[in-house]
């Protein structure tokens, strides 16, 4: 079943959190001259038009990137992220397009770095391929992203980031995430892994945390932003990023960023945030 389309959700609060974390990790990898490898397991189309029927139907971006767009007091790290999105909008004042994780990563790649983008959805893959057809550093595959973790690691660069962000439309995705991490870590223990997760039902989310703890892997950081308290009702109340082998600066950076994000994205005052270690070093 491949019914999920990210265009309904592009630019929402979950994307904001995910893409700021992605940017900070890639910026850290760029501190060394040696090239790195980036794998995006569930790439989507890479770029989203916010005037599309899907985006307008939900309007989720208005409570995400839309609430940061005109802010004049952005913390430095958030300002760099917003600047990237404004570049995609041709520097204009109007927010018309939003970047998916592949486009944010491609913007940060240097000539010595490379990326592999995988997307299995039959209608999304051709768009993704077309969006990166001129980028020599980027390879696009129509394939199962979970399987690519095992197939492509370790990379020849011996440095890199794996982003795993499935839609979780299948309950198996929660277990497949943990399995992919186990397979990847066995092959590439020094790599950084970033897992995006939604909080729809907290018990499902805990399956990822418990599964990762059971692997025995160390240095697992959890970063979470909630827009409202957990609920038994259907709907995403929060989202987060689990980062294995995070840059040493990431914990501090997110603790500085999240109070501002929570206040700005959730002006109603129902938001909260967490930065904590699932397993320390």
From Swiss-Prot:
Entries under PROSITE patterns matching the protein? N6_MTASE (PS00092)
Which of this chain's residues are annotated to bind S-adenosyl-L-methionine? 19, 42, 101, 119, 144-145, 165
Q: Which domain of life is it from?
A: Bacteria
- rRNA processing as a keyword? yes
EC number(s) per UniProt? 2.1.1.266
Please name the GO terms that the record assigns under molecular function. Answer: 23S rRNA (adenine(2030)-N(6))-methyltransferase activity; RNA binding
Catalytic reaction(s) noted: adenosine(2030) in 23S rRNA + S-adenosyl-L-methionine = N(6)-methyladenosine(2030) in 23S rRNA + S-adenosyl-L-homocysteine + H(+)
Q: Which GO terms describe its biological process?
A: rRNA base methylation
Q: Which key words are in the record?
A: Methyltransferase, RNA-binding, rRNA processing, S-adenosyl-L-methionine, Transferase
Q: Which GO terms describe its cellular component?
A: cytosol
Report the active site residues: 165 (proton acceptor)
Instruction: Tell me the enzyme class.
Output: transferase
List site positions: Interaction with substrate rRNA: 4
Has UniProt tagged this entry with the keyword NAD?
A: no
Show the InterPro entries listed in the entry.
RlmJ (IPR007473), SAM-dependent_MTases_sf (IPR029063)
Q: How does it assemble?
A: Monomer.
Give a short account of what the protein does: Specifically methylates the adenine in position 2030 of 23S rRNA.
**HAMAP family linked to this entry:** 23SrRNA_methyltr_J
Give the family this protein belongs to, as stated in its UniProt record.
Answer: Belongs to the RlmJ family.
Q: What is the protein's name according to its record?
A: Ribosomal RNA large subunit methyltransferase J
Species this chain originates from:
Haemophilus influenzae (strain ATCC 51907 / DSM 11121 / KW20 / Rd)
């Amino acid at each position: 079943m491949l019914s999920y389309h990210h265009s309904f959700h592009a630019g929402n609060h979950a994307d904001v959190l995910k893409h700021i974390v992605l940017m900070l990790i890639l910026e850290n990898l760029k501190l060394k001259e040696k090239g790195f490898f980036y794998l995006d397991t569930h790439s989507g189309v890479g770029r989203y038009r916010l005037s599309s029927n899907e985006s307008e139907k939900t309007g989720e971006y208005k409570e995400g990137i839309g609430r940061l767009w005109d802010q004049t007091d952005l913390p430095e790290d958030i300002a760099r992220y917003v600047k990237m999105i404004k570049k995609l909008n041709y520097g204009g004042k109007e927010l018309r397009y939003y970047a998916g994780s592949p486009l944010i990563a491609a913007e940060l790649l240097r000539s010595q770095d490379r990326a592999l983008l995988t997307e299995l959805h039959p209608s999304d893959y051709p768009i993704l391929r077309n969006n990166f057809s001129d980028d020599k550093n980027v390879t696009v595959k129509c394939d199962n992203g979970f399987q690519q973790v095992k197939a492509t690691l370790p990379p020849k660069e011996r440095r890199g980031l794996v982003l795993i962000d499935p839609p979780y439309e299948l309950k198996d995705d929660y277990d497949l995430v943990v399995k992919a991490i186990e397979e990847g870590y066995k092959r590439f223990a020094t790599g950084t892994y970033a897992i995006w997760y939604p909080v729809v039902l907290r018990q499902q989310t805990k399956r990822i945390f418990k599964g990762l703890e059971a692997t025995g892997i160390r240095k697992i950081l959890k970063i979470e932003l909630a827009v409202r308290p957990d609920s038994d009702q259907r709907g995403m109340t929060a989202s987060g990023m689990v980062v294995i082998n995070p840059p040493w600066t990431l914990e501090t950076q997110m603790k500085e960023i999240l109070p501002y994000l929570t206040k700005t994205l959730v002006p109603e005052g129902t938001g909260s945030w967490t930065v904590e270690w699932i397993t320390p070093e």
